[in-house]
Amino acid sequence: MVAATAEFRRVFSAFDRDADGKISAAELRLCMKAALGEDMSAEEAEALVSSADTDDDGLLDEEEFTKLAVQLEMGDEEERCRGLMEAFRMYEMEGEGRITPASLKRMLSKLGSHQGIEECQTMICRFDLDGDGVISFEEFKIMMDA
C-alpha cells in the first residue's frame, strides 16, 4: 500500500495543475483526458469530486483524492473479478468450481479448437499450482494474468 500511496501522490501532483494542493473538477477532466484519453463531462467530473469531497469545498485535497483513487481501483478489480468469474463458469463443468480436462476439452470444442484430453491435461498442468489435476478459480485468475 505504501507504493500505491506514493503513486497516488505522484498522480495527485500531476493532476494539480495550479499547484494549490487541491484538484478541481476542471483539473480532473483535463488530466483524465491527457492521462487516459477519456472524455469526462463537466457533470461527471463534478459528481466524482462531490462523491469524495468530505469538507464540501468543491475540491479534492490529497487525502480525498487518494481515497477516491482507492475506491475506483477497488471497483475496477471487482469488475475484473466478475468478468473472470463469468469466463471461468464457461469452462467449468457441473458447477463444481473447477476446470477439468474434460470441461476444458468441451469448451474448446465449442470454440472450434478440437484438442484431445491429453492436450487439455497438459494445458491444465501449466497452471495447476496445487497439483490436484484441475484449475480452481484462484489458479484461473493467475493464469489469466500470465
Swiss-Prot record:
SUPFAM superfamilies reported for this sequence: EF-hand
One Pfam family here: EF-hand_7
Binding site for Ca(2+) 3: D128, D130, D132, E139
GO terms for MF: calcium ion binding; enzyme regulator activity
Keyword set, alphabetical order: Calcium, Metal-binding, Repeat
Domain (EF-hand): residue spans on this chain: 3-38, 40-75, 79-114, 115-146
Binding site residues for Ca(2+) 1: D16, D18, D20, K22, E27
Annotated Gene Ontology cellular component terms: cytoplasm
Keyword Metal-binding (UniProt): yes
Annotated positions binding Ca(2+) 2: D53, D55, D57, E64
InterPro entries in the record: EF-hand-dom_pair, EF_Hand_1_Ca_BS, EF_hand_dom, EF_hand_pair_protein_CML-like
Coiled-coil ranges per UniProt: none
CDD domains in alphabetical order: EFh
Signal peptide segment: none
Entry function: Potential calcium sensor.
Name of the protein this chain belongs to: Putative calcium-binding protein CML19
Organism taxonomic ancestry: Eukaryota, Viridiplantae, Streptophyta, Embryophyta, Tracheophyta
